[in-house]
């Protein structure tokens, strides 16, 4: 079969047999692709360090149902700034695992590819900001069709004005104070900033206060977990280094 070339971000890689690796890629053209890189463990010329997690690469592959075949890869960037910072490593690992777990095989999403690329570039530039993680998550959910409705109660449907008290419900839903009397509070500031995350689409444009960051984090954590069958492997480590 004829090979094709596309840009990709490495989501995961594992050793396979004596000399091969199985690699999960998020490609710009084909979406998520799993493939075998034959001889990757011994061929520095064809692959080198290009198959490391969250590397951005140009990859030559033969796309097939099931496992594709990787013919070669060139490094666009390894994001060296990320690899020098423990918190950045944890956040990048969380982001690529989130994409891997949510995205089905063979479903291209150029918007999500740009979002993930922008987040990795942001992490590569220096000290990771807690607000950036929540910005990424809010836009991630929006792109995949899981946007949290901030304007109406998910239970009774009542409209929630900007100054209304909001509560978290099951599965990361927003409830009015009456329906969500036992849920955690989401104040007007947190709700407004979450809305701005979607509206601006630019890292660094939205900064949460410590309180609004906690409130938004509780809501987003619930919304993300609601669509997963098991916890993310990266989450336990991330919670140790990124408490908010």
Swiss-Prot record:
Signal peptide: none
Domain of life: Bacteria
GO biological process per UniProt: DNA recombination; double-strand break repair
SUPFAM superfamilies linked: ArfGap/RecO-like zinc finger, Nucleic acid-binding proteins
GO cellular component: bacterial nucleoid
Keywords: DNA damage, DNA recombination, DNA repair
Annotated PANTHER family: DNA REPAIR PROTEIN RECO
Protein function: Involved in DNA repair and RecF pathway recombination.
Family: Belongs to the RecO family.
Annotated protein name in UniProt: DNA repair protein RecO
Organism: Geobacter metallireducens (strain ATCC 53774 / DSM 7210 / GS-15)
């Amino acid at each position: 079969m004829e090979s094709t070339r596309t840009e990709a971000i490495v989501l995961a890689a594992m050793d396979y047999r004596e000399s091969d690796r199985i690699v999960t890629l998020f490609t710009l053209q084909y979406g998520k692709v799993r493939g075998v890189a034959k001889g990757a463990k011994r061929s520095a010329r064809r692959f080198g360090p290009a198959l490391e997690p969250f590397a951005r690469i140009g990859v030559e592959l033969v796309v097939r149902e099931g496992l594709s075949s990787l013919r070669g890869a060139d490094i666009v960037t390894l994001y060296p700034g990320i690899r020098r910072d423990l918190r950045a490593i944890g956040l990048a690992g969380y982001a690529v695992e989130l994409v891997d777990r949510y995205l089905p095989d063979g479903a291209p999403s150029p918007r999500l590819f740009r979002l993930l690329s922008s987040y990795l570039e942001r992490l590569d530039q220096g000290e990771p900001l807690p607000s950036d993680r929540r910005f990424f998550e809010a836009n991630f959910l929006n792109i995949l069709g899981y946007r949290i409705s901030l304007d109406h109660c998910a239970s009774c449907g009542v409209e929630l004005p900007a100054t209304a008290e909001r509560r978290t419900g099951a599965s990361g839903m927003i409830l009015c104070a009456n329906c969500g009397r036992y849920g955690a509070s989401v104040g007007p500031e947190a709700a407004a900033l979450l809305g701005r995350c979607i509206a601006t689409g630019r890292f660094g444009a939205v900064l949460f206060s410590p309180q609004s960051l906690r409130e938004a984090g509780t809501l987003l954590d619930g919304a993300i977990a609601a669509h997963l069958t098991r916890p993310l492997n990266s989450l336990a480590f991330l919670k140790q280094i990124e408490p908010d």
